[in-house]
């Protein structure tokens, strides 16, 4: 690693010597300056010494995204997908680092930050982007300035602020495929000139599901989402500005059906034998205050409180009871949860001298989670596994209460329903002190150094109750109604631990020409340790923090008199104690059917290149192009089966060698390109754009329970397009008409998959098919 860093420094020093010799051609179309907040202050994206992609309000309008998920692949080495285990659940990876799960007790590796408030978990992170003025995707560890759980990077969302002295309306109505209908509105109301303004917004989005259920009939995957926001902005003088925001979210969408890994070729036909309703209700209150103490110093306070509950019913087996899947042929959990988050951050930033800036801060985070899971599962095994000769019925096995598979017969034997309730929870308290210094010895040279001290404590609790009766449920029986069932106490434990860490960052940034600068940066990240909430015993619950360090070199440049930007970066990332999930099937009769543990794997090293270009070709045409590569080596680690009562069919004492090779969602290459066209036509402006993104082969899932628990996804490409007409009315108001389509080639691709303790049981989730929509937008 040291040799590689030495080579990187040599590259940085050598690069500027060649670049100024490149001729700069003329162009009539300048590139508009883009402002980012990647270092907790407003700066031009071309001046920031790190890899960041930013989408401004106009670009967001052009892309026609519904949620954050629609930004998948639009920045180098960035994957944004869904997770079907919960409402609005995100699976976000940057540079091959991310979290594929859904538990609120295991922190994501990529943080989503909305108006300076970090979301507490991946639930609900695929936010609607109607009321958004910019989205910044920062790649690489961001731990010093943004805190824990940002070792892959972060996505910073800045929403539209209330405006003084200006009444405004922005509303959109759209209809589309699968009975899609969306209504969005935002109103800005000035209350007191230059002092008080109010913003009110609301969203309603509905759509029928893409999936037909061949077992129970009907459609699945419906969308039913609503949200409201109210923001009050107060500025009593030129030195103080405060925004108080209230948000309410009600999401009653169905999760994406858990389609079996073995269901056949039609990706939108599922054989699951259970509906999968969800509910997600959240109330959030935040207060952001800025006080310019003097012309050289600003104090910022961000306070946020988030309280909510969600409930998800799943069919994790993805099949009907007569399937050949084993060892699990039925796994039906219901997971109601209640959660509360509170966070407070204080930052003091300013200038010590004309060449020396500083920032110091304090961060506090507190959360409480109460979790209940009702589980109803059936274990199924081939009769041969039980030693039954051909022709001998399953019921002949004494003392187990077996029955034959209802469809296939005695070739597969099923154990009676295992029923359980789990009561669990976790309390978290995390504090941090951080600071940075920025020194500019000359106008063209800048150095930054920063440090963060993290102190975190977690308390976990878990208790199981067994409701099994040794019998099978009657057809049509509610799988989660345990009224009158036995109440046999199972495993019960409490756990507690704390962790401390100090992480650092440093960068050097050199504007070696009027149109170009080179930089080198070093950054570290910290991902919280904790306790697996789905662990069945105290021995397998704990896992340690994950740490990351990265070195990056980059070039940022403007050409053709500002019409072309060309940015190039190379990074090396090393992770210690990477957290990998293993799902282990438990023996028949053991509740809740599976044991989920979090392993701290070996060292994982990766490196890659990233290219970003934007070119205003002329007054009418523009182009965006980005590309990324990932070369990764994940160290192997072992899973001692004796501490988890055996790994499925393996006896206690078995040691499984896991890890090595690729982890999930680490394609070796990916790229995207967007072409846009605008022209005055009649009284309005005609616009059109088309985009294509390509993803290379990658490992979609590795559940860490054995070499067969891997599923690879082949390379695929997605094509989107949009055409619109923008008309200014006599009143000065504007109307925009837009027709757009996504995945126009109807490409088949998987967004997620999960093995349930073995290669013959598990589910997969497919990406959306080709869809179109027509939207009308009014603004004044």
Predicted segments with their positions:
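Transmembrane beta-barrel wall of Gram-negative outer-membrane proteins
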Residues: 168, 175-207, 211-254, 280-287, ...
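Structural signature of Gram-negative outer-membrane beta-barrels, strongest in the C-terminal barrel
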Residues: 233-237, 348-351, 363-365, 424-574
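Gram-negative outer-membrane beta-barrel transporters
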Residues: 358-359, 443-447, 567, 572-574, ...
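N-terminal periplasmic accessory domains that precede
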Residues: 68, 91-93, 113, 137, ...
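Membrane-embedded beta-barrel scaffold of Gram-negative outer-membrane proteins
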Residues: 288-316, 511-527, 542-638
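Solvent-exposed loop segments that connect transmembrane elements
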Residues: 211-219, 256-273, 315-334, 374-423, ...
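Short acidic/polar hinge/loop motifs at secondary-structure boundaries
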Residues: 102-103, 110, 115-141
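Conserved C-terminal beta-signal and adjacent last beta-strands/turns
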Residues: 336-361, 367, 551, 661-780
């Amino acid at each position: 690693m040291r040799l590689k860093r030495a080579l990187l420094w040599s590259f940085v020093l050598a690069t500027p010597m060649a670049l100024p010799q490149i001729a700069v051609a003329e162009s009539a179309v300048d590139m508009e300056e883009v402002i980012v907040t990647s270092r907790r202050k407003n700066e031009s994206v071309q001046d920031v010494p790190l890899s960041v992609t930013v989408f401004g309000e106009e670009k967001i309008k052009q892309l026609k995204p519904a949620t954050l998920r629609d930004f998948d692949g639009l920045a180098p080495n960035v994957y944004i997908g869904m997770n079907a285990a919960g409402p609005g659940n995100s699976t976000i990876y940057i540079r091959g680092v991310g979290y594929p799960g859904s538990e609120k007790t295991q922190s994501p590796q990529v943080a989503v930050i909305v108006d300076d408030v970090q979301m507490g978990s991946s639930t609900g992170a695929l936010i609607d982007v109607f009321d958004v003025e910019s989205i910044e995707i920062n790649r690489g560890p961001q731990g010093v300035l943004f805190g824990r759980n940002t070792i892959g990077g972060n996505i910073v969302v800045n929403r539209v602020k209330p405006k003084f002295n200006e009444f405004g309306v922005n509303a959109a109505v759209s209809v589309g495929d699968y009975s899609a209908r969306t209504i969005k509105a935002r109103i800005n109301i000035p209350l007191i000139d230059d002092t008080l303004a109010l913003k009110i917004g609301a969203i309603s989005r509905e759509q029928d599901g893409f999936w037909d259920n061949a077992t129970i009939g009907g459609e699945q995957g419906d969308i039913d989402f609503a949200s409201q926001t109210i923001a009050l902005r107060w500025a009593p003088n030129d030195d103080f500005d405060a925004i108080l925001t209230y948000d309410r979210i009600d999401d009653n969408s169905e999760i994406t059906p858990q389609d079996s890994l073995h269901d056949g070729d039609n990706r939108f036909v599922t054989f699951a034998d259970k509906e999968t309703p969800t509910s997600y209700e959240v109330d959030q209150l935040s207060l952001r205050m800025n006080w310019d103490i003097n012309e050289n110093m600003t104090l910022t306070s961000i306070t946020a409180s988030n309280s909510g509950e969600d409930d998800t019913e799943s069919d994790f087996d993805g099949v009907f009871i007569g399937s050949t899947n084993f060892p699990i042929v039925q796994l039906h959990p219901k997971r109601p949860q209640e959660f509360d988050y509170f966070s407070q951050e204080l930052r003091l930033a300013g200038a010590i001298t004309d060449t020396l800036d500083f920032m110091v801060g304090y961060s506090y985070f507190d959360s409480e989670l109460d979790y209940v899971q009702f589980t109803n599962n059936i274990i199924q095994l081939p009769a041969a596994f039980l030693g039954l000769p051909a022709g001998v019925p399953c019921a002949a096995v004494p003392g187990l209460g077996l029955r034959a598979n209802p469809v296939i017969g005695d070739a597969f034997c099923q154990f009676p329903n295992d029923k359980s309730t789990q009561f669990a929870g976790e309390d978290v308290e995390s504090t941090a002190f951080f600071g940075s210094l920025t020194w500019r010895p000359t106008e063209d040279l800048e150095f930054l150094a920063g440090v963060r001290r993290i102190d975190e404590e977690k308390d976990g609790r878990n208790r199981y109750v067994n409701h099994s009766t040794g019998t099978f449920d009657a057809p049509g029986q509610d799988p989660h109604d345990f009224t009158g069932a036995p109440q046999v106490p199972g495993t019960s434990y409490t756990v507690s631990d704390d962790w401390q860490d100090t992480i650092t960052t440093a960068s050097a940034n050199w504007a070696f020409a009027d149109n170009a600068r080179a930089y080198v940066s070093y950054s570290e990240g910290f991902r919280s340790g904790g306790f697996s909430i789905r662990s069945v015993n105290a021995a397998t619950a704990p896992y340690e923090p994950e740490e990351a360090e990265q070195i990056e070199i980059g070039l940022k440049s403007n050409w053709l008199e500002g019409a072309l930007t060309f940015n190039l970066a190379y990074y090396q990332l090393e992770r210690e104690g990477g957290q990998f999930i293993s799902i282990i099937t438990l023996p028949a009769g053991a509740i809740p059917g599976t044991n989920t543990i979090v392993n701290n794997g070996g060292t994982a090293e990766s490196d890659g290149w990233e290219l970003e270009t934007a070119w205003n070709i002329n007054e009418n045409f523009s182009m965006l192009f980005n590309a990324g590569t990932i070369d990764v080596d994940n160290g192997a680690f072992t899973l001692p089966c004796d501490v988890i009562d055996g790994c499925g069919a393996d006896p206690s004492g078995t040691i499984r060698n896991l890890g090595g090779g690729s982890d999930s969602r680490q394609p070796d290459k990916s790229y995207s390109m967007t072409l846009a066209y605008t022209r005055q036509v009649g009284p309005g402006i005609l616009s059109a754009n088309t985009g294509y993104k390509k993803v290379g082969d990658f490992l979609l899932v590795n559940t860490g329970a054995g070499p067969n628990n891997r599923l690879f996804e082949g390379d695929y490409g997605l094509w989107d397009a949009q055409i619109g007409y923008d008309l200014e009315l006599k009143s000065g108001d504007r109307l925009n008409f837009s027709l757009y389509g996504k995945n126009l080639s109807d490409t088949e691709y998987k967004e997620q998959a999960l093995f349930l303790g073995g290669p013959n049981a598990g589910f997969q989730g497919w990406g959306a098919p080709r869809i179109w929509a027509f939207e009308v937008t009014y603004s004044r």
